[in-house]
Amino acid sequence: MVEFLILSFTLIPFVLILIQPDLGSSLIILFIGLIIIFLNGLNIYKIISGIIVLLAAIPYAWFYVLKDYQKSRVLNLFDPFSNPLESGYHSIQSSIAIGSGGLLGKASEYGTQTDLLFLPETHTDFIFAVLAENYGFLGNLIYFVIAFLLLSRLIKITLDLHLHSNRLLAVTYVIIFIVCFLINIAMVSGLFPIVGIPLPLTSYGGSSLFIYLIIFGLINALHNRKTLIAN
């Protein structure tokens, strides 16, 4: 019953966002929903059956569902220089920005990719490339340490929850944060197709920041409720 409810609440936004069309965001929502169902204790045979169905659907989706620009994004993941001025442009400029940052970055100099506007969407989807060019490897390392500390705290709070429903809810929020964080970093680094996923708590955008603040507030509320019950 729980799996059915989770799947229902996953498929509704998946279909609506897919119709927009926004294939990347819809697939991420579906992926997060499937992870939650798996963590809720879905039968292993059902999991294997679902994986087989998804794998079998890939050829059909490639030839009959995906549009040309969506296919080009996937192909450019392997060879962005095949179309350097169109679909591969973002990946190339982002990789150059990350690589040119070096160890300490160019914050005291002039960032070629960001300041000269070669890199698009510098304040939203590709903000990590801007950080890499301006503050280099050391700046990225500090950024990852801060993100790791935040994530560690979220996971600790989640594991401390006793009620299964509360823990499942908190796990959902943590997975949303992890998936969006990793996909954005992989996308900017050229390890994932370009999708419109902002970097949590870093990319410019009121709605994105507002949602993550709500998520952290709900996790904190679950933690406080557990503490009150214990006392």
How does the language model describe each region?
Residues 182-231:
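A juxtamembrane structural motif centered on a specific transmembrane helix
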